[in-house]
């Protein structure tokens, strides 16, 4: 090797002064890795306590069986609790249903009672109004029986107010008003008012012989009682002449 090549190598690989002072180490003198550094067990070494704890935690078949029994017991307890809660809620629901049915029935009765009272009140008001018109009807009836027209003019007037009377009676019928017809019927204080009593053998005792003032009904309500003459049995020893009792001579 010539000097030019050595000079070129020195320029290519310069060596620092510090590196030149470090002594070279031979392979025999380099440190070798020990077993402890490589992670291999050296001699007798104690087992890791965490591994033992994990093993104890996992347990054997007996411990697993006990754990399953505990879970089943807890689930059964929860199931019994839910069943008890369901039974209580079912009882509460039945109680609410019963109260609802009772309340619905009470409300229905209240509605019917209110409707009935309303109808009765309306009928009562209507009856009072119609009662005020009954004397007018009586006057028309008396005029019809007592007035006898003698001329064509009087007859025309008579027909005119009798036409008014007919219209009035038809209107009352349309409102549900009906006259009583008590003749020949047993006396009933609910509908009749006895004005006269006549001894007679022609009718049974307490039979209505004649209606003196006509009575009227509004459906089943008495607007005015019928004023009547009632038959009574003749006294013993009394002679009945033309339906009237008289003393024997």
UniProtKB/Swiss-Prot annotation:
Among SUPFAM superfamilies, the record links this protein to: Coiled-coil domain of nucleotide exchange factor GrpE, Head domain of nucleotide exchange factor GrpE
Domain of life the protein comes from:
Bacteria
The answer to whether UniProt assigns keyword Signal to this entry is no
What the entry lists under InterPro entries is as follows: GrpE (IPR000740), GrpE_coiled_coil (IPR013805), GrpE_head (IPR009012)
Q: Which CDD domains match?
A: GrpE (cd00446)
Example GO biological process: protein folding
Q: Which Gene3D superfamilies match?
A: 3.90.20.20, Head domain of nucleotide exchange factor GrpE
State the residue spans of region: Disordered.
Answer: 1-68
Q: What GO molecular function annotations does the UniProt record carry, in alphabetical order?
A: adenyl-nucleotide exchange factor activity; protein homodimerization activity; protein-folding chaperone binding; unfolded protein binding
Q: Does the keyword Cytoplasm apply?
A: yes
Question: Where does the record say this protein resides?
Answer: Cytoplasm
Q: Which GO terms describe its cellular component?
A: cytoplasm
Entry-linked Pfam families:
GrpE (PF01025)
Q: Which residues form a coiled coil?
A: none
Which residue ranges traverse the bilayer? none
Binding partners and assembly: Homodimer.
The record's NCBIfam families line, in alphabetical order, gives: PRK14143.1
What protein am I looking at?
Answer: Protein GrpE
Q: Which organism is it from?
A: Synechocystis sp. (strain ATCC 27184 / PCC 6803 / Kazusa)
Q: Which gene name does the record give?
A: grpE
């Amino acid at each position: 090797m010539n000097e030019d090549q050595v000079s070129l190598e020195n320029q290519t690989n310069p060596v620092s002064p510090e590196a030149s002072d470090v002594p070279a180490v031979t392979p025999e003198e380099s440190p070798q890795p020990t077993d402890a550094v490589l992670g291999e067990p050296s001699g007798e070494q104690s087992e890791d306590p965490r591994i033992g704890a994990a093993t104890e935690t996992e347990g054997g078949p007996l411990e697993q069986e006990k754990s399953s029994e505990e879970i089943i017991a807890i689930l059964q307890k929860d199931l019994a609790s839910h069943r008890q809660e369901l039974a209580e809620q079912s009882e509460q629901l039945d109680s609410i249903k019963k109260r609802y049915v009772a309340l619905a029935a009470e409300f229905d009765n209240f509605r019917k009672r209110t409707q009935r009272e309303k109808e009765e009140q309306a009928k009562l008001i209507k009856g009072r109004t119609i009662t005020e018109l009954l004397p007018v009807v009586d006057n028309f009836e008396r005029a019809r029986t007592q007035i006898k027209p003698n001329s064509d003019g009087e007859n025309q007037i008579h027909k005119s107010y009798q036409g008014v009377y007919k219209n009035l009676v038809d209107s009352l019928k349309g409102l549900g008003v009906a006259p009583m017809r008590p003749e020949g019927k047993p006396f009933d204080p609910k509908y009749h008012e006895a004005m006269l009593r006549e001894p007679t053998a022609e009718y049974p005792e307490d039979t209505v012989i004649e209606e003196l003032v006509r009575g009227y009904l509004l459906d089943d309500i008495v607007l005015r009682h019928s004023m009547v003459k009632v038959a009574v049995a003749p006294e013993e020893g009394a002679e009945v002449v033309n339906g009237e009792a008289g003393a024997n001579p």
